[in-house]
Structures are given as C-alpha cells and as structure tokens.
Swiss-Prot record:
Name the record gives this protein: UPF0235 protein HY04AAS1_1378
Family annotation (Pfam families): DUF167
Family statement: Belongs to the UPF0235 family.
GO cellular component, one term: cytoplasm
Length: 73
C-alpha cells in the first residue's frame, strides 16, 4: 500500500488527519534536520496504522514535506 503524506514539522502537538484527497496530514514535533522528522514520521505512522516500523519505507520525498510512503504487508 502506498500513502500520500503531507508532513508539518516543528508542530506543537503530534496529530494525524485524513484530508479530502485521501492523503494524510501528519504534524510532528521534530525539526526537518538530519532525518529526525522522517524518523518521527515513521514512528507516528507505525503507531497510527499499528504496523512495525520496519514495514514502513519513505519511497519518495525524503527531503520534502510531501512524501510517498510505502507500507509492506
């Protein structure tokens, strides 16, 4: 499964919401420095989707706020 994710780094609170276009908007506390935001994104997604972090891969957009995230079965 591939998800379109819009990430908001440096947020005050962590949240996940589904947008009208079926993508997810995820607010995270980490800054977009040295991959910290991507690490927190994977952690938040794994908790939200109840899957292991090892089953989540950022397929595209590692240095962008808009990402394609692949979830393995």
């Amino acid at each position: 499964m591939i998800l379109r994710v819009k990430v908001k780094p440096n947020a005050k609170t962590v949240s996940v919401e589904q947008l009208e276009d079926k993508s997810l908007k995820i607010s995270i506390k980490s800054p977009p420095v040295n991959g910290k935001a991507n690490e927190e994104l994977i952690k938040v997604l794994s908790e939200f989707l109840k899957v292991s972090k090892s089953k989540i891969n950022i397929k595209a957009g590692k240095s962008s706020r808009e990402k394609l995230v692949e979830i393995y079965d």
